[in-house]
Amino acid sequence: MRNRLWAVSLALVLCASPLLAQNGYDFSRFKTETWRFIQKPAHWKGDDWLKAGLVCAGSVILAATVDKSVSDWGFRHPKYDNSVPIVIGEIWGGPFSPPLVFGFFAVHSWLTGSETSRKISFEIVQAVVYTVPTTFLIKVAVGRARPKEDRGVDYFRPFSKDSLLHFNYQSFPGGHISMSVAISTVLAKNARPWWLKTVAYLPTALTMASRIYQNKHWTSDVFCGAALGHFIGDWIVAQHRKAGPASGAHGFSIQPYFGGSSFGLIASLPL
């Protein structure tokens, strides 16, 4: 069911993407950058391998040291399962937030002609298209049982029917986490002030907490998913920093406004 929801989310985003077919943000560019993304691991350099190695090492260390104790704590304290922060975290990392975020910036771009909104919308599409299958492939390759299966931290069914078809054996890495971090990274990289960059990551922090607290994932699953989402989101934004129409976009910003007896916030999206 969950994988079908992600498929629907992906379809909605892709169907709406013709809104972006202006100023170079079209299928041709998407196809070129997607092929570049697929080829990227074959062209990794020393620092790329170092990052991957550190993430793997960190995941192993967390699995060996804190996964079980954190999971046990969550099982013993379930009373906040339906609390507002946990629910917000679940929604932000779920399949409904990407179409909503994409739709907001796509509609704003369509109404105002904002190049920045168009760029962000395009990058949200890429974040979904790249993150979902990448995460799923790793899940199938690892086949780790979720905490709620009660099989322990070291139960794996790699490249098996279970890991391919059964949600309960797709724990590593965290899919909600990788998707939420990828989207938050895209938003943060396009924001100007540091505090707005921080705000972009706040719902992701709730997603991480909710997945661990509800025993949907081990701590190491969340760590690896967050790293994966960050690397993908960062790579996407970097493609548009190098060249092309996005190079003139300077990001969106929100500033406080005070004037006479009125005050509020002003959102700025360069045209």
Walk through the language-model features, giving the residues of each:
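Alpha-helical transmembrane segments
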Residues: 52-56
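Well-ordered alpha-helical segments within folded domains of soluble proteins
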Residues: 58, 101-105
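Alpha-helical transmembrane segments of multi-pass membrane proteins
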Residues: 59-68
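Interfacial/capping segments of alpha-helical transmembrane domains
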Residues: 67-77
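Juxtamembrane helix-capping/reentrant segments at transmembrane boundaries
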Residues: 79-92
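Hydrophobic transmembrane alpha-helices of multi-pass, membrane-embedded glycosylation machinery
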Residues: 105-106, 205
